[in-house]
């Protein structure tokens, strides 16, 4: 497992580092809280 950063779709800040299995090929998307936007927004895996 390796850690990948999650980036907010709205403001683009990297808020979270989450573990991901290396055998998954699709990009991870989660709804998480963004402290810059002060709201729950979609966060996508960035490289």
Curated annotation (Swiss-Prot):
<dbReference type="InterPro" id="IPR001705">
    <property type="entry name" value="Ribosomal_bL33"/>
</dbReference>
<protein>
    <recommendedName>
        <fullName>Large ribosomal subunit protein bL33</fullName>
    </recommendedName>
</protein>
<dbReference type="Pfam" id="PF00471">
    <property type="entry name" value="Ribosomal_L33"/>
</dbReference>
<comment type="similarity">
    <text>Belongs to the bacterial ribosomal protein bL33 family.</text>
</comment>
<dbReference type="GO" id="GO:0003735">
    <property type="term" value="F:structural constituent of ribosome"/>
</dbReference>
<dbReference type="InterPro" id="IPR038584">
    <property type="entry name" value="Ribosomal_bL33_sf"/>
</dbReference>
<dbReference type="GO" id="GO:0005840">
    <property type="term" value="C:ribosome"/>
</dbReference>
<dbReference type="InterPro" id="IPR018264">
    <property type="entry name" value="Ribosomal_bL33_CS"/>
</dbReference>
<dbReference type="GO" id="GO:0005737">
    <property type="term" value="C:cytoplasm"/>
</dbReference>
<dbReference type="InterPro" id="IPR011332">
    <property type="entry name" value="Ribosomal_zn-bd"/>
</dbReference>
<dbReference type="GO" id="GO:0006412">
    <property type="term" value="P:translation"/>
</dbReference>
<dbReference type="GO" id="GO:1990904">
    <property type="term" value="C:ribonucleoprotein complex"/>
</dbReference>
<keyword id="KW-0687">Ribonucleoprotein</keyword>
<keyword id="KW-0689">Ribosomal protein</keyword>
């Amino acid at each position: 497992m390796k850690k990948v950063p999650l980036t907010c779709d709205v403001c683009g800040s990297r808020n979270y580092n989450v573990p991901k299995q290396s055998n998954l090929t699709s990009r991870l998307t989660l709804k998480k809280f963004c402290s810059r936007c002060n709201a729950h927004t979609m966060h996508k895996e960035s490289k």
